Amino acid sequence: MRFRARTNRFHAANYLVVKAYVGVTDGNWYQFLADRPQLQEVNFWRPASAQGFRALQVGEPFFFKTHHPHNRVVGGGFFSGFARLPISEAWELLGEGNGAASEQQMREAISRYRNEPISPRDDPVIGCVFIRDTRFFDADLVAGPPPDFASNVVQGKGYDLAERAYAGYFVDLFHRLIGTDVEIDLGAPWHRAGPVYGDPRLQPQRLGQQAFKGVVLDAYQHRCAITGAKIRPVLQAAHILPLPKGGEHRLDNGLLLRSDVHIMFDRGYLSVDPKHRLLVSPRLRDDFGNGEEFYSRSGMQIVLPERKADRPHREFLAWHVDTVFKTA
């Protein structure tokens, strides 16, 4: 499906959306976030982590629907990634963006949806569906339920927007979300690689800032990509191409690194070549007289995410080697 957006300032190029998802929201979660419009990045959490979330690709729209009998679509945003995280880490990342005023309130809300209550010492892993650029509709803008959404659907339902039966409903819903007039061209084929558009909300691979941290943690299975360290408090999501240099919050622009390794990477004492092999600068020994932990790993492949699409992009790695790495 191809959309065309119009605003008062510009007539945007076509932007492309192939799917949408409508999730059933907890009423307290929705009301808490609707009262805090400044929270633009939220966690649509799931009380258990057994199932992942593959219904959308990053950048596709995610809408929030209340339970019956209210049964209205009350807002939405753009899918920004999925991660399995302990409750404490989800709270550390997003705080009130989890839909609660405190970590304890978040734990209590999650406990109500689990088969067993959460004991004070437990820190269970939950499913975190990150949504960015969220908007909750005013009372006069809430929409009725989407087509074919059965009352017994518990978590939510995905929709293929290329199907004409759903097109009109979601064009209207999309307009409510982004605040522009929308046209639709059902004859245009979907092509994932399309350009990056003027409205930053519609960039297909961009993650929210906190979602970037969460999905990098999850993709690297909470292990430093260079040392394999698993001590969670010292693990940091590093950008290969930094934001001030034009980098983005993208999973393939990220590495999970121990905090001291992160500093050495940013300063060029360490790098990773486009074949994902560790590079160690001779300057590390010259400047500090040590670094054997890293020289012993030089030339070895780093820890990588399981999915090839999530692994560091060759272009970003080549930039770091050419621009940041201290060759001598």
Q: Residues of each region from the PLM?
A:
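Compositionally biased, charged N-terminal/linker segments
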Residues: 1-61, 66-68, 135, 141-153, ...
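Short, structured patches in soluble enzyme cores that scaffold and shape functional sites
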Residues: 132-135, 163, 228
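Short, hydrophobic/aromatic-rich beta-strand segments within well-structured domains
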Residues: 59-66, 129-130, 224-225, 256-260, ...
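Polyanion-binding interface signature
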Residues: 56, 61-74, 223, 238-241
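Aromatic- and Lys/Arg-enriched surface recognition patch
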Residues: 72-154, 277-295
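Short, well-ordered loop/turn elements at secondary-structure boundaries
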Residues: 16-17, 57-59, 124-125, 220-221, ...
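A detector for short metal-coordination/catalytic motifs
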Residues: 207, 211, 229-235, 240-328
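Short, charged surface segments at domain edges that flank catalytic/cofactor-binding sites
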Residues: 46-48, 183-223, 241-252
